[in-house]
């Protein structure tokens, strides 16, 4: 059964929610790979203009942070409430994003031992670089669609 959710733009008031959720989900990985959690780093990287809040039953249950860059789109963060892990919401959110941006490169960085890595690989992301316990991954543009748009059948 498909779970219903909606997505709304974030505002400054969502900062604490996003901070707490990210720390809850990622603290162990940050400690294992980078020696600890640095609150100032999260604050420095948080831009509500790039963040969308996932809502279910009128409650925040996660967020997605993406920004355009010179290569296409960069997924800065996707976090869901632990109670939703493994229930298909993250897959659906990412599939919709990939469909909207199918003609662009979509990049992300993840820890090599992050369980979400399997999801990214299943959705077609490939590893382009392995560095200090992290993986740079990319989903290549849909070449068929790109070539049709350019008239190169």
Regions inferred by a protein language model and the residue ranges of each:
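Conserved beta-strand in the GNAT
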Residues: 59-67, 74-79
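Short hydrophobic/aromatic beta-strand element in the GNAT-like acyltransferase core
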Residues: 50-53, 63, 77, 107, ...
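A short beta-loop-alpha structural element at the N-terminal edge
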Residues: 5-20
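C-terminal "cap" of GNAT-fold acetyltransferases
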Residues: 69, 104-117, 121-153
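A short, internal acetyl-CoA/4′-phosphopantetheine-binding micro-motif in the GNAT/acyltransferase core
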Residues: 78-85, 110
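Conserved acetyl-CoA-binding loop-helix of GNAT-fold acetyltransferases
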Residues: 86-99, 118, 122
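Conserved GNAT-fold acetyl-CoA-binding loop/helix
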Residues: 19-45, 49
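A glycine-centered beta-loop-beta connector
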Residues: 14, 55-59, 72
């Amino acid at each position: 059964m498909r779970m219903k959710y909606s997505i709304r733009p974030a505002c400054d008031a969502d900062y604490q929610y996003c901070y707490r959720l990210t720390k809850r989900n990622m603290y162990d990985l940050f400690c294992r790979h980078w020696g600890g959690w640095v609150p100032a780093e999260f604050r420095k990287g948080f831009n509500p203009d790039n963040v969308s809040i996932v809502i279910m039953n009128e409650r925040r249950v996660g967020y997605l942070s993406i920004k355009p860059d010179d290569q296409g789109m960069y997924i800065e963060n996707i976090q869901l409430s632990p109670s939703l892990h493994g229930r298909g919401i993250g897959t659906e959110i990412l599939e919709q994003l990939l469909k909207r941006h199918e003609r662009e490169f979509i990049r992300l960085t993840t820890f090599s031992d992050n369980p979400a890595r399997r999801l990214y690989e299943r959705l077609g992301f490939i590893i382009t670089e392995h560095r200090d316990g992290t993986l740079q991954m990319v989903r290549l543009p849909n070449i068929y669609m790109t070539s049709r748009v350019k008239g190169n059948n």
